[in-house]
């Protein structure tokens, strides 16, 4: 089987969004992730940044490669960078000229700020009816009390309920280990933009897409939100355990913890056989998942005692042989030492920063996979190139 990283666009398999131009006024994570998804799919993304400073994430290190933080590099491949001071007539003029050539404009300023820059989205779409615009906000432009509040991921993790269900049962609320809600919001925004482009191609008219970090975050609560809305259950923290499935959590073997995911009664019965207690599957307290959820505090200590008798690799081998989903809990070095993790790494020959190793796009098509056409840009790297394009002159 071919390595997915070898399945790259060619002259006969152009990238799906080839020919689409995106003006990217976003920064930090959610917006840049959205535009990176579009760039990976072939769009020409022009990232507009503040002169001398650029996207804040350029400075969110160490570690750094060259002058830019790894954080920035993880979100900005396949883009071009131009600098523009939106507080100056020249900067605003540049954005207007870019928009005149664009299919999509994406921004994540606080509500109302684009109009202060003389870049009101309604005015832009009136001048360019085919333009798709996308705003990523913290709480939505219409939120009465919170519209102007900044939307850092950790703030919304706290306000959306995510932190209330994350952490050990008797511990403090804990944030997720990555800015997961920014990632989810960026993906929702990309879906919305793609849908608006599809509609634009059919009708000839663009549409405004709006995604609020808070809204996407509450939507991401899925079953936990439904447990409350339907059952009136205020969920709490369960560590690695699942509120609706038992056993579905980490257990500590003799040497280290691992994950067990017995997602149905059949898998639970197999687990009981593996640990040498087949009778547990017939115990009325544990025979069904509903019963196991009710009697969680009786079952988990029994399983914990059994799993403490062997080393992790022994249990994983036995569970895997029985067809029970299980996995080691891996650190980053273990992830990228595994065959699966290594296959997701792309090596990029960056003429400024040297050889970069970054995580590649996870999207696969039957005959291609998005690849890094260009490394993440240095600040203002394409100032001359893009301005010459707008003037109709040759590339430098």
Can you name each region flagged by the protein language model?
Residues 141-142, 170-178, 201-217, 236-243, ...:
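Conserved Rossmann-fold dehydrogenase catalytic segment
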Residues 45, 82, 209-211, 326:
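Generic structural signal for residues in well-ordered beta-strands
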Residues 1-192, 196-202, 378, 382-396:
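N-terminal helix-loop segment corresponding to the beta1-alpha1 unit
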Residues 79, 153, 182, 204, ...:
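Residue-level detector of functionally special positions within alpha-helical transmembrane segments
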Residues 1-52, 108, 127, 132-134, ...:
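Acyl-CoA thioester-binding alpha/beta core of soluble enzymes
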Residues 70, 217-219:
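Substrate-binding strand-loop-helix patch
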Residues 154, 188, 209-217, 263:
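NAD(P)-dependent dehydrogenases' Rossmann-like dinucleotide-binding region
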Residues 85, 167, 210-212, 261-262, ...:
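Short linear motifs in exposed loops
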